[in-house]
């Protein structure tokens, strides 16, 4: 049986961080409906509670019956000063009505210490508590391990502890993030391969950025090494140099690698221009 790769589109969230990309709620709805026709598995609609456009999107998209896609809401782990059940960010995800909640957390020990000013063990508790809290109220919870590859190269033991914490708390898939876009394909493939041995029970996904023009290549080799979920955007739109381009990745995985991605691959021909057109309007 052909392996199915889970496609997770973040055009409506990470893609909107690109320069001069401003999408209204109607724009987001139109793009989401096109992505659903395309056969995308998950559409990350935005960060609930962060701005009026995203709040309106989650309310409006609930009025549509989607054929293929499930809607995901994005957010962060709970604030260190908040009790998990009182954290407005997590409660906004739950209130969004989205099927899936995806939260990010620090997977680099240095960032936990210097950016969050937290004891690394406290960071693990925050990740564990945040995932477990969402899991009680949302059908599906995913965890984005921010700066994973940089963190792993500095302190592999700690980064592995982060993945274990998220998995044990109930995260269905953990997405390994090349947040700075600086990891080379050979080292990324080796790390993912090592994780398949160290954590065989953990389902992995991949989220790459294109600062070194490696986002597509890194995504492909991650899948070849065992990643099951691919995060990216249409046309690679995203902050700085962009995200992994799903319009390049999907044909490679489906045609060159023989993996199942889309129900109707020909849809790529008319889906690709959509976000670019709206972003420029």
Task: Annotate each language-model stretch with its function.
Residues 2-79, 83:
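N-terminal capping/small domains of soluble enzymes
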Residues 12-26, 75-83, 114-119, 147-156, ...:
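Active-site mouth loops of central-metabolism enzymes
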Residues 15, 35, 101, 143, ...:
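Conserved, mostly hydrophobic/aromatic
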Residues 26-38, 86-103, 107-113, 121, ...:
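Alpha/beta enzyme core
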Residues 41-65, 74-77, 106-117, 147-150, ...:
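Glycine-rich, proline-tolerant flexible connector loops at the mouths of alpha/beta enzymes
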Residues 55-76, 125-137, 191-204:
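Alpha-helix-loop-beta-strand connector modules within alpha/beta enzyme cores
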Residues 214-225:
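Catalytic cores of alpha/beta
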Residues 270-281:
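Single conserved hydrophobic/aromatic residue that forms the stacking wall/gate
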């Amino acid at each position: 049986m052909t392996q199915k790769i889970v496609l997770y589109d973040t055009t409506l969230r990470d893609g909107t961080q690109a320069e001069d990309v401003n999408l209204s709620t109607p724009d987001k709805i139109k793009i989401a409906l096109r992505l659903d026709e395309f056969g995308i598995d998950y559409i990350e609609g935005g960060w609930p509670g962060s701005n009026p456009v995203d709040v309106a999107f989650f309310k409006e998209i609930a009025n549509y019956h989607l054929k293929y896609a499930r809607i995901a809401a994005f957010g962060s782990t709970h604030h260190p000063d908040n009790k998990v059940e009182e954290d407005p960010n997590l409660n906004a995800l739950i209130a969004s009505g989205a099927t899936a909640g995806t939260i990010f957390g620090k997977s680099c020990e240095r960032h936990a210490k210097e950016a969050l000013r937290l004891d690394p063990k406290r960071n693990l508790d925050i990740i564990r508590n945040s995932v477990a809290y969402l899991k009680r109220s949302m059908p599906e919870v995913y965890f984005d391990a921010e700066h994973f590859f940089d963190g792993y190269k500095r302190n592999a033991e700690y980064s592995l502890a982060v993945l274990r914490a998220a998995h044990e708390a109930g995260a269905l898939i953990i997405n390994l993030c090349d947040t700075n876009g600086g990891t080379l394909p050979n080292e990324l493939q080796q790390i993912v391969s090592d994780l398949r041995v160290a954590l065989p029970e953990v389902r992995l996904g991949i989220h790459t950025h294109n600062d070194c023009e490696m986002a597509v290549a890194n995504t492909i080799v991650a899948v070849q090494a065992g990643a099951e979920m691919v995060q990216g955007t249409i046309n690679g739109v995203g902050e700085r140099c962009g995200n992994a381009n799903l319009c390049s990745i999907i044909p490679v995985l489906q045609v060159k690698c023989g993996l199942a991605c889309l129900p109707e691959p020909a849809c790529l021909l008319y889906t690709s221009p959509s976000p670019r057109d709206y972003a420029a309007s």
